[in-house]
């Protein structure tokens, strides 16, 4: 949905296989919502609780849930009337945290900034002409009411991830935390990425007994933190940038999947 990270095929398969026998799904780091949307369409009966600490993002999801048609209508008008996406991007960026605007106006601003930013990184990125052409499209806007219907039964919160951690035997938790890399990708100018405590995160997850799947960047340090968990790597690139040494570095990166339970569909 949002270009925060892509290539969720393996997590989707693993989560999907578990939800056949679960009735509660939790996602503490909602982000672009790809996994939660898939789970909602595949298992519409589930109790789904999603969360993110980044308030402009959760505000968007909450408004989309309540006013999907209105968001689509307003965005259609804005796109037709706007001749300069860069100016629209900068104006929208200034609205995100300004409570002088309505939640609907801030949600619309978030959508514009997300779709027009480099790699969809919103406040942690700059304007991208390529992204504004490819992603801020009528096709995407027209699909918003459809997404609104899918998420009607979601519980959407703006809180710390740990409130969703549980020991419930009928719950499954998918966690997609900020990656432990040099680039600060999340929050306002990367503040939420920079301040994330990875050691504390590993400790809190390890203390819980509900079934959990975590997607992370792969490193020996992370593997050591989760030494009791099943781990698997796969190639994964999550950027729109495709030139030079940066792309070469991206291609060498691996995604790490961590499970605190045994799974037949999980390859170590």
Task: Locate each region found by the language model.
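Single conserved hydrophobic/aromatic residue that forms the stacking wall/gate
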Residues: 1-21
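Short His-Asn-centered micro-motif
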Residues: 28-29, 51, 157-159, 175-177, ...
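Short, solvent-exposed loop/turn segments at secondary-structure junctions
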Residues: 32-35, 54-56, 116-119, 161-164, ...
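SAM cofactor-binding core of SAM-dependent methyltransferases
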Residues: 24-91
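Short loop/helix-cap segments at secondary-structure boundaries that form the rim of catalytic
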Residues: 42, 165-168, 221-228
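SAM-dependent nucleic-acid methyltransferase catalytic core
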Residues: 65-187, 200-203, 219
């Amino acid at each position: 949905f949002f270009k925060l990270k892509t290539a969720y095929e393996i997590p989707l398969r693993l989560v999907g296989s578990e939800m056949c026998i679960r009735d509660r799904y939790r996602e503490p780091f909602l982000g672009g919502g790809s996994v939660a949307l898939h789970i909602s369409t595949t298992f519409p009966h589930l109790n789904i609780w999603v969360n993110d600490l980044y308030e402009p993002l959760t505000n968007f999801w909450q408004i989309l849930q309540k006013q999907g048609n209105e968001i689509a209508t307003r965005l259609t008008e804005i796109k037709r009337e706007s001749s300069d996406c860069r100016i629209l991007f900068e104006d929208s960026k200034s609205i995100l945290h300004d409570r002088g605007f309505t939640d609907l106006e801030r949600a619309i601003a978030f959508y514009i900034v997300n779709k027009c930013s480099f790699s969809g990184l919103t406040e942690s990125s700059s304007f991208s002409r390529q992204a504004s052409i490819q992603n801020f499209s009528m096709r995407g806007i027209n699909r918003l009411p459809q997404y609104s219907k899918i998420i009607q039964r979601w519980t959407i919160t703006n809180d710390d991830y740990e409130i969703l951690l549980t020991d419930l035997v009928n719950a499954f938790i998918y966690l997609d935390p900020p990656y432990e890399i040099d680039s600060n990708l999340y929050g306002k100018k990367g503040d939420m990425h920079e301040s994330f405590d990875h050691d504390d995160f590993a400790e809190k997850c390890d203390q819980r007994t509900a079934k959990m799947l975590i997607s992370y960047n792969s490193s020996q340090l992370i593997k050591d933190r989760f030494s009791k968990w099943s781990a698997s790597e796969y190639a994964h690139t999550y950027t729109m940038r495709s030139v030079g040494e940066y792309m070469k570095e991206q291609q060498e990166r691996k995604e790490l999947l961590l499970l605190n339970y045994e799974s037949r569909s999980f390859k170590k």
